Structures are given as structure tokens and as C-alpha cells.
A protein has these predicted regions:
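N-terminal leader/targeting and accessory segments in enzymes
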Residues: 1-88, 223, 227, 257, ...
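A short acidic, helix-capping loop that chelates divalent metal ions and anchors anionic groups
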Residues: 72-73, 140-145, 202-207, 376, ...
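Short internal beta-strands
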Residues: 62-68, 228-232, 369-370, 393-401
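Acidic, Mg2+-coordinating active-site environments of NTP-dependent enzymes
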Residues: 3, 7-9, 67-73, 168, ...
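ATP-dependent carboxylate-amine ligase
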Residues: 1-13, 35-38, 51, 84, ...
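Short secondary-structure boundary segments
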Residues: 66-69, 177, 199, 232, ...
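Active-site regions of enzymes building and remodeling cell-envelope glycoconjugates
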Residues: 73-82, 146-149, 245-250
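Phosphate-binding loop of NTP-binding sites
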Residues: 7-10, 86-228, 232, 236-244, ...
Length: 482
């Protein structure tokens, strides 16, 4: 591809390269740069890509895309933001694949993963569509599963994934769009037919300076979509949409809106309600428990409506939808009279939601096993401790993903918020042992909620990912004790 074709979507500040030059690929990691490639010097959190220009040149880079003139004697192009430029040249390199598919973006603190899976199911059931999914647990091309390491991949990998989806026959793509991705321009150049917002609660304050900054980052989605579907019951919504340029639709479980849930019934095995939208009404039954499921369902229904699907067909498809791995997932406990749930509740709001849901159907004690991640927002630790103290009968504080922090210091910060607990918290830093302790002390009718890991099958300790699948911990305990 000619350099000028890659530069076409950019606002170029300085051009010191032959626009007719052939480019053989794009690289933003000097360690993997190949001869003839365009090297994009991206400024990262830990390192500035401009420092690695000499290495990229040494490896044969044909030209450099940068924010300031390099010292090396090499053809270069200066732009205002290489992060944004990486997204745009990557889209051009792969032939703008997102332009050929219907793109749906989901943002919010909690509920994104469940919402994407539900919407994927609806589109497959009602349209027979082949749907791509970009998410926390995994990426999917139709039924093919691809493992993933972050909610939204770096822009080059994202465009490559879109190209693979389009080549495989996908007509729709549903993405979890994180605040990081919006802030760091990973989705620059992608236009969404529909964007929808689940909720906003405290999280990622290690990255965003405050909740207002976090909200504003999420709100960027509604400047790059045609229709936005937003939660009218969330107090952050007015700020979120203040700069929206798209058509806005609102959904609510409390008051009249473009889509409203009426006659809500919460059950131990799911929820049901009447969805009302203009002159349409349909009964919705979804086999995922919790009041938060009503909101996830409303957002998904409204997004599907925005794509032109009738309410009755959407409701029928939802009735056959299954739960998502690591989201209120019931773990088999044969021979035991108690229940074990695994849930990805790693924020104050999600922890409160799952514990309230469990308390609504639990016949015995609610036992919460939880911790907080290291190298992440420390302010939520005592808050989550207070939530567990208030809503759990027994709280077992343990290690989550401590990363480079001292796990015992994280636990100390959690316990600092647990004054007034029904019983003093039990502290067991070793997570498998904490799970076993909970199972040792569970009585008939109790529900043990393993919070924070969800779909993850590893624990991050230091810079290492160590295998830890809570399902295996439960199964191993049962094998030894039955």
C-alpha cells in the first residue's frame, strides 16, 4: 500500500517522506518491526515510542509516524496524536472493515459483558446473523472463540480482528467499549450504528482523575454513533449525554421512558417484566437472576429496537438466552445442601448487586468471599468492605489479583471499612484456602458467593499469571471431603 493511502485520513502536520513510497505493514512495537513497515511512535504509560525509533530504523522501518521530528535520518511524518493516528492508519491498512458491518458499542461500569452476549443471541436468533463479539471474557467470530486480555484491544489488533470478522462473513459486531479505549483513541475511526450505556459507578479511578472524568470518557461513545440508548435511572446519564451528537433513546425501570419495564418480578432463577415501548408491549422472561438483569435486558432490547427489530421477536429471543460464564454462575456442588456462585463483582456497585440478589432468595446465610485487585483504584477497597459487612452474614476477605502490591496491605484497607459487620470478617490471604474455609463452614441453605474473579482462570501475583480456576478449587474440595 502507498504511504499516501495510509495518510489520507490523518491531519498531517509535517510530511518528510515520499507519499508514493510502498509500505509493507504497520508496527508500533520496535521489537517486531519488519523491513518496509511504517513505525508508529506511540506514547504509552510506561514508555515513549519515540525512544524506540532508532531500533525500528535498525530493523528496517520504511518511515516513521511521530509527534516530533526524530533524530534518526529516516523519512517521517508528524501528526498531533500518534495514538489516534495508529487507529486511523490501521483501519486504512485493513480496508476499513468496520464500515462494512453494523457496529454496536456497549459502555458502562457493570453489565457490559452480559449485555453483549444477550444482544449477540438476539441477533443470531431473529436475523440468523453471523455476529462478531469483542469483550472481556473472549472475542468471538460467530461461534469461534478467541481468548482476550483486555476489554478493548489496541487499535491495530482491533482493526485486524474486524478484518477477520468481515472476511468470515460477520454482518454485525458487538463491542464492549471501555473508558480506556475511548480515552486512548483505540476506537478512533470506528462509527457505531448503536451505542448503549448500562450504568456508571466507582471504578478505574487509578486511570481517571475523578468520577466526572470517568463519566466524560464514557460519554465520548455518543459522539461516534447514530443512536444512543441510555439508562434514564442512572444519576450520571445527564452528564454522560451532554455533548452527544446522536439520536438519544432512554430506558427505565422506574418511570415512563422510550422503553419502560413494568410489573417486574424477581425470582431465584431469573426475572420477568413487561417491556413497554410506544404502542408495543411484550412479556420478557430471562433466566438470569437479579434486579440489575432488568436493566441489562432493557438496554439490550432498546439497542435491538434501534436496529429495527420488533419488540415481540426480541422478547422471544431473550427467553432462550443463557447466562454468561462468571456472572452469577452456579457451580455444581453434588452431595451438598449449599450453593456456590461465581461472579465477576469487582466494583462496589457490582458487589452490592450480587449480594442483594443472593439475599433475595437465600434460605440460609450469605457467605461472601472477596478481595480487591492490586495496582488499581484503592479508594473502592474500604467501600467494598463496608458493602460486604452490611449485606453478607459472613465475609471472608482474601486476595484477588494483588499484582505488584502487598496482598495483606490490600486486605487491611478492605477491613478498615468493615466496622459494624454482623460477624468479624475472616481474613485468609490464600484464595483457594479462603474458598475451602467457606465450604467447610457452610450450612444447608447457605449461599457462598465467590466475588471478583468471574471468568478468570488465573491469579496475577507480581508480574506473573498463575493458574487459578475457582471451579476447580470447588470440585477438588468436594472430591476430598465427600
Amino acid at each position: 500500500m502507498k504511504l499516501k493511502e495510509l495518510l489520507a485520513p490523518l491531519d498531517v502536520c509535517e510530511l518528510h517522506a515520499d507519499p508514493e513510497r510502498d509500505i509493507t505493514g504497520i508496527s508500533y512495537d520496535s521489537r517486531t518491526t519488519q523491513p518496509g513497515e511504517l513505525f508508529v511512535a506511540v506514547t504509552g504509560f510506561a514508555a515513549d515510542g519515540h525512544k524506540f525509533i532508532p531500533k525500528a530504523v535498525e530493523r528496517g522501518a520504511a518511515a516513521i509516524l511521530c509527534e516530533r521530528a526524530p533524530e534518526a535520518d529516516v523519512p517521517y511524518v508528524v501528526v498531533g496524536s500518534t495514538r489516534r493516528a495508529l487507529a486511523l492508519v490501521s483501519a486504512a491498512w485493513f480496508g476499513h472493515p468496520a464500515d462494512h458491518m453494523t457496529m454496536i458499542g456497549v459502555t458502562g461500569t457493570n453489565g457490559k459483558t452480559t449485555s453483549t452476549y444477550l444482544l449477540k443471541h438476539i441477533l443470531e436468533q431473529t436475523l440468523g446473523a453471523k455476529v462478531g463479539l469483542v469483550g472481556t471474557i473472549q472475542n468471538m467470530i460467530g461461534d469461534e472463540v478467541l481468548e482476550t486480555e483486555r476489554t478493548t484491544p489496541e487499535s491495530y489488533e482491533l482493526q485486524k480482528l474486524f478484518a477477520e470478522m468481515y472476511a468470515a462473513g460477520c454482518t454485525h459486531v458487538i463491542m464492549e467499549v471501555s473508558s480506556h479505549a475511548l480515552t486512548l483513541d483505540r476506537v478512533a475511526g470506528v462509527h457505531f450504528a448503536v451505542g448503549f450505556f448500562t450504568n456508571l459507578t466507582e471504578d478505574h479511578l487509578d486511570f481517571h482523575k475523578d468520577m466526572e472524568d470517568y463519566c466524560d470518557a464514557k460519554g465520548k461513545l455518543f459522539g461516534i454513533c447514530d443512536t444512543g440508548c441510555v439508562n434514564a435511572d442512572d444519576p450520571w446519564t445527564p452528564r454522560l449525554v451532554k455533548d452527544a451528537t446522536c439520536r438519544l433513546l432512554r430506558y427505565s425501570a422506574k418511570a415512563a421512558a422510550d422503553l419502560t419495564a413494568e410489573h417486574i418480578a424477581l425470582h431465584s432463577d431469573g426475572v420477568e417484566f413487561d417491556a413497554v415501548s410506544g404502542g408495543e408491549r411484550a412479556h420478557v422472561r430471562l433466566g438470569i437472576p437479579g434486579a440489575f438483569t432488568v436493566y441489562n435486558a432493557l438496554g439490550v432490547i432498546q439497542a435491538a429496537q434501534a436496529l429495527g427489530l420488533p419488540l415481540e421477536k426480541i422478547a422471544a429471543a431473550l427467553s432462550t438466552a443463557k447466562g454468561v460464564k462468571g456472572r452469577a454462575e452456579v457451580v455444581p456442588t453434588p452431595g451438598k445442601d449449599y450453593t456456590v456462585l461465581i461472579d465477576y463483582s469487582h466494583t462496589p456497585d457490582s458487589l452490592e448487586n450480587i449480594l442483594k440478589t443472593v439475599r433475595g432468595f437465600c434460605r440460609g446465610h450469605v457467605i461472601a468471599v472477596f478481595g480487591c485487585g492490586g495496582d488499581r483504584d484503592p479508594f473502592k477497597r474500604p467501600i467494598m468492605g463496608g458493602i460486604a459487612a452490611r449485606l453478607a452474614d459472613v465475609a471472608v476477605v482474601t486476595s484477588d489479583n494483588p499484582r505488584t502490591e502487598d496482598p495483606n496491605e490490600i486486605i487491611r484497607q478492605i477491613v478498615a471499612g468493615m466496622d459494624g459487620a454482623k460477624t468479624p470478617p475472616t481474613v485468609i490471604e490464600n484464595r483457594p484456602k479462603a474458598i475451602e474455609w467457606a465450604m467447610d463452614h457452610a450450612e444447608p441453605g447457605d449461599v457462598i458467593v465467590l466475588c471478583g474473579k468471574g471468568h478468570e482462570t488465573y491469579q496475577e501475583i507480581g508480574h506473573e499469571k498463575r493458574h487459578l480456576d475457582e471451579r476447580e478449587v470447588v470440585a477438588s474440595y468436594l472430591e476430598r471431603t465427600l
